[in-house]
């Protein structure tokens, strides 16, 4: 509609059904990964893309230390459901976007350096860490990231609720296509 094309494609994240998106408009394009492990379908969707916004989790060692969890649990989270900085760098390199952005990433002054260092082992192109209110300007000439300036923050007011979600069930086995779509190196 109005010259905008949005295309979804499957990605790999815990349960079958996760998707990423590609948005094309006026000769410009953006790919958003959603939560995913490194995935062939995502790289294929990046053909000629201007901006790739890809989820990235901190290294397992950093997650373990900062979240106070055992290293083996952090490794399972980062490598089993998300994308490490090094693997994000590999995806950025294969995708060939004009600019890449890491999102879904909590960093502080102690961890931003290690995240970039690990990502840089696989990719040396333009990359930013996006956060809430990051704005991207994508034009024929350039792709720029900046932070929006907003008025005073207001916490949302949450009303009373007695809604309960469905009970959690055991995860289903992964679909067969994951084995050929997963990028491991």
Which residues are covered by each model-predicted region?
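Core dinuclear metal-dependent hydrolase active-site scaffold
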Residues: 1-45, 132-172, 177-185
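Cap/insert and terminal regions of metallo-dependent hydrolase folds
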Residues: 20, 26-29, 37-134
